[in-house]
């Protein structure tokens, strides 16, 4: 597959770099991450192995409470500057409702210094938001509040 073709795939849009073991957690049964041989030699875990440091995670969530419960475990098992994507239902989704959107529901991650940096459309039902540790985000001084300036919401 040429580099141009790869960028058209979901994994390409998510900046997947060939990691040999990844997490795809809480995905719908009919969700397909890749077609063909793209993940042929990759171990895809559907739960986080607490003993393994992951470089690439995709976690589907529908409620803020799920973010609150999953975030600490995901961050504990994420390698330094690993790729962490949270997928949430679009407002136009026909498969149910969510209390999450691009701008709301991510406080549990923000409280641990992770902020949404990139967004991609997964399919007609889901969007994905990449979270990154503030220490790796350039020009952070004006974009994000310092820890002691955050609201208690």
Regions found by a protein language model. Give the residues of each.
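Flexible, glycine-/basic-rich loop-and-beta segments that form/coincide
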Residues: 10, 135-153
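Conserved class I S-adenosyl-L-methionine
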Residues: 14, 19-27
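Short, charged/polar "capping" segments at the starts of alpha-helices
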Residues: 29-35, 94-96
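A short glycine-rich, Lys/Arg-flanked "PGG" loop and its adjoining helix->strand segment in the class I
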Residues: 71-80
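Conserved beta-strand signature within the Rossmann-like core of class I S-adenosyl-L-methionine
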Residues: 81-90
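Conserved beta strand-loop-helix elements of the APE1-like EEP
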Residues: 128-136
